[in-house]
């Protein structure tokens, strides 16, 4: 019994690193480091135990060819071929990843070899793969494997032999005009193949294909350049807004734009569209959580469909039109199930195709998701219903929206304005606003929308009554009424007399007595301001303690760095305006605290060490390790001082004079020595250096039997 308990404990044992990884995934399901830990652990376990981890992995990253391949290889290793085929059915058509497709072909080749129909199945698999992934820049090996497979097929009789030659030639000719790496080698192999069949016919066959091959080879070089730097194995994660991600997005878009520019210079619109869509498919494997990529792909298909329809190719036009709808469907069914932008774009696309029932199903599908705010969905749904089916249909959607407890006040504003603008019925709009006021009377934004509507109608009495109702009913908390009071004052300033203005100001001061105690003049600013014009300078407004309620509200709604500066004028005088300069992020700075007596090789300031450049890393690997050098160590300061004191000569003659201590005596004619012994033996005296006593007494005389000098003199003679 104790042995069985130990076995169960061993089976249930979970390593600490796995527990930490699981905890990280609870906080962030897209933590790639945590997933790497789980993958390594799964690879060391039996497939029956690891399958759950793999299923979680491909569910979290359904577009990652690398992760699907890991899962499939684990099943192949366990010889679970029925499960392998089901996995291929789940991922192969959706994930156009070159390594995954190579794995598929390898699986068919290894497992179907003993079947009677192996040759047909293998040929179908290769044709299927080339049709889907043949435009991949790294697809050379698939083309070559297919050709070698066809060459190895046994052919009995001349008819079968001709069939095989035709099949091989067809694949060669398709491959030689397809831009990819190693296209030159494929072309050379094709030349040899044709020459091996019929050398006389080969010349014409090669000449016919040569121009297309040269074009494909040119494009292949551009293709390789534009794909350089793309991280094509990165799993698709939600936007992180990092510089590295922005760089990858930019590179992917450049690749797609390059394909759109028609580098092959072909007139076949179908081929252009297929190549562009292949680029989009490759991009979506990595950037599947970016809605703009999905939308642009669908838009491109829609444009191509219209272009083909204009040319009369109705079959391909319909094919691309349906494929555009399929792009939207894939997006909202997989990675972007809650992305309203794509739902709305999908609905508009189907509306343009007059498929209204489909549009209703799209909106209802989004509304069925429980953990979303459906307010904007109902608003767009109402607008569609009014456009496509009339005002009555829009009213039905509004009724449905009122019954949904998740909706907010915006649907009432939309419905009221829709009635006013479309049915021209002010009374219906007025009733909707009144109905909403009972439910949302404590929300300033709704009250302001109602006020704007009445102001637009120029109904002064009704507007004034609404102000009084809202401000005296007690439904609106005092802390939320600031903007209503500001709007009331602006209203009276525009249409009322001075007495009514002063009355509103007094009531407003009473409502905010604690906040504006001693700052009565600040309230005066609102009486005289207009839009972004103020009766005081910015510094004076600060001194008054003035606070613009409407501006503060707008700043809270609009993201400051992107939109606010262009919409909200800055309260600055011309004198106060100073040029904006780029400033460092001081929060990231490290205090300057140099180490005292820092050891050699260590940066004196903490945090000052930086990564070595790649070229320097290579050099450092070639050099011996530091422990091999025991000295002597150069005194850098003294060495630099010597360099500083050195006088660099401007001419060769001056350099010779400094080195030798005097001008050289050159022999003009005869066999005499070039230099005198006095010059050669004169000691070199450095500037700014004390002379030794021995040097002052005289020059050092060279040895009598100086063999080196004797040989030099013989050469000169």
Swiss-Prot record:
One of the multiple factors required for polyadenylation and 3'-end cleavage of mammalian pre-mRNAs. The modification N-acetylserine is found at residue 2. GO terms for molecular function: mRNA binding. It comes from the Eukaryota. Its main location: nucleus. HAT repeats lie at residues 45-77, 79-110, 117-152, 163-196, 221-261, 271-303, 319-352, 354-387, 458-494. GO terms for cellular component: nucleus. The modification Phosphoserine is found at residue 691. Homodimer. The CSTF complex is composed of CSTF1 (50 kDa subunit), CSTF2 (64 kDa subunit) and CSTF3 (77 kDa subunit). CSTF3 directly interacts with CSTF1 and CSTF2. Interacts with FIP1L1. Residues 684-705 are annotated as: Disordered. It is found in: Nucleus. The gene is CSTF3. Pfam families: Suf. One of its GO terms (biological process) is mRNA 3'-end processing. Keywords: Acetylation, mRNA processing, Nucleus, Phosphoprotein, Repeat. This is Cleavage stimulation factor subunit 3.
